[in-house]
């Protein structure tokens, strides 16, 4: 694996920081505060990334990996702030959030952003809640992904929502960051 700088980001309210806005009443009941992803993304882009780059020999091959709600944040960040991360790895992303709006709008977004580049890797294990919206995203990628975007969607029914990160992170990171 290529040398990387790994930054773990602790947050104080996971569901607030990892979720975007929602119009679904049931979504708003899962935590006292939701919908703070834009502010968390702003922190990463305007404070954390500049600090890391000023204090460490970082490259532009910036990436992000996460699962579940963090996977949702990663996919949303891919669409909301393209280019913030060159590599986005979302494992069992909670794309059911806001009635699956991110996945459902993906095809239209790709058509409007043909210059999008980078790498997007999505893997899913949970078939009933996660799978349907990941398949919608995959269909959008098949139909409309820009040619400069490298992408892969992988179904892993042998894993579970609780095991996918530990099983795949050690495999996917070296795959996305091979030795130079």
Predicted features by range, described:
Residues 1-180:
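Non-catalytic cap/lid and distal C-terminal segments of serine-dependent acyl enzymes
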């Amino acid at each position: 694996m290529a040398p990387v700088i790994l930054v773990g980001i602790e947050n104080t309210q996971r569901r607030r920081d990892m979720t975007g806005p929602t119009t679904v009443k049931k979504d708003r009941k899962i935590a006292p505060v939701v919908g703070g992803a834009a502010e968390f993304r702003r922190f990463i882009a305007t404070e954390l990334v500049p600090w890391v780059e000023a204090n460490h020999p970082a490259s532009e091959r910036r990436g992000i990996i996460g699962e579940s709600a963090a996977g949702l944040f990663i996919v949303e960040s891919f669409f909301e702030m393209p280019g913030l991360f060159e590599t986005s790895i979302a494992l069992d992303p909670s794309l059911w959030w806001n009635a699956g709006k991110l996945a459902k709008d993906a095809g239209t977004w790709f058509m409007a952003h043909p210059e999008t580049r980078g790498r997007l890797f999505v893997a899913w294990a949970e078939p009933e809640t996660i799978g349907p919206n990941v398949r919608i995203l995959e269909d959008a990628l098949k139909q409309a992904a820009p040619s400069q975007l490298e992408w892969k969607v992988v179904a892993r029914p042998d894993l579970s929502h609780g095991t996918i990160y530990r099983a795949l992170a050690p495999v996917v990171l070296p795959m996305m960051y091979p030795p130079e």
